[in-house]
A protein has these predicted regions:
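Beta-loop-alpha module in the N-terminal Rossmann-like domain of NAD(P)-dependent dehydrogenases
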Residues: 47-110
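N-terminal Rossmann-like dinucleotide-binding module
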Residues: 1-47, 389, 394-399
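Predominantly a Rossmann-like dinucleotide-binding segment in NAD(P)-dependent oxidoreductases
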Residues: 117, 124-208, 337
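Hydrophobic residues in well-ordered beta-strands that form the structural core
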Residues: 13, 53, 93, 118-120, ...
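C-terminal glycine/acidic-rich active-site capping loop/insertion
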Residues: 220, 243, 248-315, 340, ...
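Glycine-rich phosphate/pyrophosphate-binding beta-alpha loops
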Residues: 178, 206, 229-237
Length: 400
């Protein structure tokens, strides 16, 4: 049995508890920590946790604990991670890893110095749809990835600290952009270095200092673009969508709204519908199993399997550090209104090997620009001469 200490009793801690207990059949939360006694006691009762405490040090040094899960507000991550690593515990930390790259790097250094297992809990790269899509893309289904667009929008976070940039590290970018950035990396390839970022962000609705809306583009060394769209101003629920465009294909993913499960109710009697849902009447978009749909189940299954087997999980603290470095560049770009470099101290990926930007040869003299089927059954090919650059087109027999 894997014995887990849960640090944090908020919404994310509850989702984690539901996903962990019972799915592999051998994982148990044996201790929960909260800064408030009432929250700790209530969480323990709700999830069948035998012990609770308000003492962080006691929670992470408990000899009956194997794995520590950090599900605390962002400004508390570093202290919890460093104490758990010093105690020799495996550490899993929620997103974002740090409030900025410097904080994330200190946490990465702490777990690596201690030699403990570490996992970055980026659940949205573990959704069933995303896992299947990444497998298809890695298998060549869309050719070379050119562009990934990831969107997460909803009416705003569930706790007050999210709106405080000192506690959170920023606004919608650090809250949701971290999801979108890592989703794009999963499709483009985490070995491909992020080079620079351009980003717009502003506070459009809420009386706060943090940005509540942002759109950014990340340019990668391969030429691929990762685009993120995040907002705390979207009404009607939570919108989670991803798109991948490649030289040979396209992927569209819709994870939350309009997924094929819709209910209309003339009465306000539906109760809880789904995370960030704003109504319980009219057209509703329920989710059958939120912990599965949001990736929590597959994430913890993979993480805890990797811990038992002594292997690295799909997402480590290094990934969290890279995400923070990209987010830092986005914030600098908002201020400078220009492209800003992504500053990574120790890049562990590889050099880009796609040096021809995906050019396709038609014959010895021409590059193929486009091929399309005509109404008469033949194909039209549009070509560029390799030597002169001259453009031409011709109708040819369709391939059998």
């Amino acid at each position: 049995m894997t014995r887990i200490a849960m640090l944090g009793t908020g919404l994310i801690g509850g989702f984690y508890a539901e996903a962990i207990q019972g799915h592999r059949g051998r994982d148990r939360i044996v201790s929960v920590h909260s800064r408030g006694e009432a929250n700790a006691r209530a969480f323990a009762e709700r999830h069948g946790v035998p012990r609770w405490t308000t003492d962080l040090a006691a929670a992470v040094t408990d000899p009956e604990v194997d794995v520590v899960i950090v599900a605390l507000p962002n400004h508390l991550h570093e202290a919890a991670v460093c104490q758990a690593a010093a105690a020799g515990k495996a550490v899993l930390c929620t997103k974002p890893l740090g409030r900025d790259a410097a904080e994330a790097k200190r946490m990465l250094d702490a777990v690596e110095r201690a030699g403990v297992f570490h996992g970055y809990l980026e659940d949205l790269v573990y959704t069933p749809k995303t896992l299947k899509a990444v497998e298809a893309v890695r298998g060549g289904a869309v050719g070379r990835v050119l562009w990934v667009r990831s969107r997460e929008t909803h009416p705003g976070p569930h706790s007050d600290w999210f709106f405080d940039p000192e506690m959170a590290g920023g606004g919608a970018i650090i809250d949701m952009g971290c999801h979108c950035i890592e989703i794009a990396r999963a499709f483009i390839g985490k070995h491909v270095r992020p080079v620079e970022v351009v980003c717009w962000g502003d506070t459009q609705v809420h009386p706060i200092e943090a940005e509540d809306h942002a759109i950014g583009m990340v340019r990668y060394e391969s030429g691929a673009i990762g685009q993120f769209e995040v907002s705390w101003n979207f009404r009607g629920g939570m919108d989670l969508r991803d798109e991948v465009a490649g030289t040979d294909g396209t992927v569209w993913l819709n994870h939350w709204l309009r997924t094929g499960f819709e209910i209309f109710s003339a009465n306000e009697t539906a109760g809880y519908v789904a995370e960030k849902s704003e109504s319980s009447g009219g057209w509703l978009f329920p989710v059958g199993d939120e912990t599965k749909a949001l990736g929590y189940v597959d994430m913890f299954t993979e993480m805890l399997d990797a811990w038992e087997q002594g292997t690295s999980p799909r997402e480590t603290f290094y990934d969290g550090y890279v995400v923070n470095a990209i987010a830092d560049a986005a914030y600098r770009s908002i201020a400078s209104k220009r492209w800003e470099p992504v500053e990574i101290e120790d890049w562990r990926g590889g050099p880009t090997t796609e040096d021809d930007r995906g050019r396709r040869e038609y014959d010895a003299e021409h590059w193929l620009i486009k091929r399309e089927r005509l109404p008469d059954g033949r194909d039209r090919v549009i070509l560029r001469h390799k030597a002169t650059g001259e453009l031409s087109q011709r109708a040819v027999s369709a391939p059998e």
